[in-house]
Amino acid sequence: MTNYHVTLQAPYIVKNIEDVEDALGVAISHIGKILNKKGMEYVDIDVGLTICPKCGEPIDCVLVVARTAIVGILLSMKIFNAESSEHAVRIAKSSLGRTLKDIPLEIVDVVEI
């Protein structure tokens, strides 16, 4: 049995925001409240990055249109005693999926620790 660090990405929609910074803060705050309410304080929350098509530099994964934003959120957690990396991903998706209902989750990274 091996331990893994699993990172998943989730889109989160935020409404009635003023700017990008507001969207980022509200998205992280809302996800944090949901996870903490279910006792999942051990999940690390961060903003995803994407590559700017013009300059090639990494930028925050957020799009704001008409005071509504979609924010790419990274969720990382350690999974202990998994049989394989695939098993660790299934455990992470199951744990987060039950808490973050109706929010799709995608694998970003799995590292053996």
From Swiss-Prot:
Domain of life according to the entry: Archaea
Family the entry assigns: Belongs to the UPF0212 family.
Protein name: UPF0212 protein Maeo_0273
Species the sequence originates in: Methanococcus aeolicus (strain ATCC BAA-1280 / DSM 17508 / OCM 812 / Nankai-3)
